[in-house]
């Protein structure tokens, strides 16, 4: 399930700040029930956190962002926001006025998607981005299969990286994340594709990676 969250900015103390990925993660986790929030936050493998999100888009005193994930997680978040719609994302205090479900993918044979993904290998004990498209395709498939298993969804999914550009973004103080802006051709079984599209493609989606949009 993918939702658009929008509303008003009550206060913002750092006018130069534009990247809120770490703050969005903290806000999202804080608005989930226990033990769901603890279970997600304490997972050893960040590869299988079944949600992702966009940055916050700001215009004047308005904001919006997108959050996408497994239905039970998103519905839990919505339920808690209905109880208290004032949230904090780092230096901002926001009042959420509207939550609107986004349209699901229409069933077809293949999809052209764009967005930012992480696909890594471990070298000398450190995670490094994969370089070759073939290796990235295989890793995206492997991670997707792991997520589908957790979701009890059967089905095949295949990836083909058509274009990629290396990006480095600030996550929080002292931590920068390397990823690829990609154009992906995705094919396979509709149910598998639909669920992976919702929960995020690739690794480390809880940092705001893996939110893809159909071209």
Describe the function of each predicted region.
Residues 1-215:
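RNA-interacting cores
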């Amino acid at each position: 399930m993918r939702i658009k969250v929008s509303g008003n900015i009550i206060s913002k103390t750092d006018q130069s700040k534009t990247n809120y990925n770490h703050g969005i993660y903290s806000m999202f986790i804080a608005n989930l029930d226990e033990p769901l929030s603890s279970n997600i936050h304490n997972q050893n493998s960040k590869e299988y956190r079944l949600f992702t999100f966009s940055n916050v888009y700001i215009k004047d005193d308005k904001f919006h962002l997108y959050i996408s994930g497994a239905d039970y997680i998103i519905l839990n978040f919505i339920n808690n926001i209905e109880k208290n719609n004032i949230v904090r994302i780092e230096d901002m205090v926001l009042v959420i006025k509207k939550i609107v479900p986004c349209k699901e993918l229409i069933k077809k044979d293949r999809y052209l998607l764009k967005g930012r993904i992480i696909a890594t290998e471990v070298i000398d004990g450190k995670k490094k981005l994969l370089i070759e498209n073939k290796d990235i395709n295989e890793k995206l498939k492997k991670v997707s299969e792991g997520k589908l298993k957790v979701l009890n969804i059967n089905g095949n999914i295949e990836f083909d990286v058509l274009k990629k550009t290396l990006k480095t973004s600030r996550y929080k103080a002292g931590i920068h994340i390397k990823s690829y802006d990609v154009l992906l051709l995705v094919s396979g079984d509709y149910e598998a594709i639909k669920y992976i599209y919702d929960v995020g493609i690739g690794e480390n989606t809880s940092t705001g990676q893996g939110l893809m949009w159909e071209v």
